[in-house]
Amino acid sequence: SLKKYKITKNYFLPLGKSLEYGNIKTNVNYANTLKLFSKYGSDVFYSGTIGEDIISTVRNVKVNPGKLSKIDLLNYEVKERNPVCSLYRKYKVCGMGPPSSGAITINQILGIVERYDLSKLGYNNSETWRIIGDASRLAFADRGKYIADSDFVDVPIDKLIDKKYLKFRSNKLETKMKIPEIKPGLILHKETNNYI
């Protein structure tokens, strides 16, 4: 929750409540962070003040503190990853591949809802939000089972964003009711085109 942490509470909930639609919010701290990067490069992150702030926050957070150290940042090596892309209607949607789960999950959600005309249903329609919510739950179930660091685990990216698989998963949304129990889909081997 945004209320848990003073910094997020102050930023996102000024005066104790969220901003109204149309309000403009600036982020001076983020602007200052970008200025530091432009002036000092990545060193400000790995061995400078930004890294020190991150380490302090991770180690001193009240809920589930971590053990991140300066050595961890200094020893970190950037790895380039192939993007994960999929078509949603006429748009090519791309994002970072594993170990990040974002691109796969977003492309799954979009693939699952693609058969629905959400604009026709309308933004304030409960059915629109049920479809989006259940599609998200299905994608997050797959994320929890199949997505990890591809340096250590074989992540079936192509199968997870396969149009036939996502159409099969979207069949679960036909109930007109919230899906009571969400389970990850069963990704089968190459020799079959069936999904469970």
Which residues does each predicted region cover?
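Flexible, polar/acidic helix-loop-strand segments at domain edges
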Residues: I104
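Protein kinase glycine-rich loop
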Residues: Q108
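Solvent-exposed loop/turn segments at secondary-structure junctions
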Residues: P99-S101
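Noncatalytic scaffold domains of N-terminal-nucleophile
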Residues: S1-G41, F45-S47, G51-G97, I161-D162, ...
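A generic secondary-structure signal for well-formed alpha-helical elements
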Residues: F37, G41, F45, V58-K62, ...
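Internal maturation/activation junctions in enzymes
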Residues: G16, R115-I196
